[in-house]
Amino acid sequence: HGAFMGVGAYASAILTMKLGVPFWFALPLSGLVAALVGMFFGIPSLRLKGLYLAIATMAAQFIIQYLMRNADWLTGGSDGMSVRAPSFFGLPLNTDRRYYFLVYALVILATLFTKNLTRSRSGRAFVAIRDRYLSAEVMGVNVWGYRILSFGVSSFMVGVAGSLWAHYVLVISDEHFTIGLSVQYLA
């Protein structure tokens, strides 16, 4: 997840600083970019489970981190990128307290989304695949489609978190999104 957080952070930085997109549009767009990248890396790992899936996602981590470091023309390489603090109706969110309320509101929205997702058809399919993979497949659940969707949803959430984080710390580089961050999130 550390790599997809980095994708969201860099996507937000590129959208706001290079393309001039306002933060409030860049926030969901960076999540969408991270979701697309997550789904892209999810496709080859559809047949994998358990430890092998973990190894495949670690490979994605290293590939993404390599691209963040070596695509100087896009990410600034090891120098990183600078971003601006967002503002809300002219009020700059440049203090910890102000930014806290933004993050708190988005955490509430994310909680409501995930709570409703678990009650939906897709959420029930996720649970069925997690609990009994073969049984879900026999019952007609599109296991491949829902696994890709789960990669996309989780990457979207962490991509939005990366966007928020980038605009909080104001400077991002590939060193922020190492394998250690991914292990920290999983542990």
Describe each PLM feature range:
Residues 1-187:
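Transmembrane alpha-helices and adjacent helix-loop boundaries
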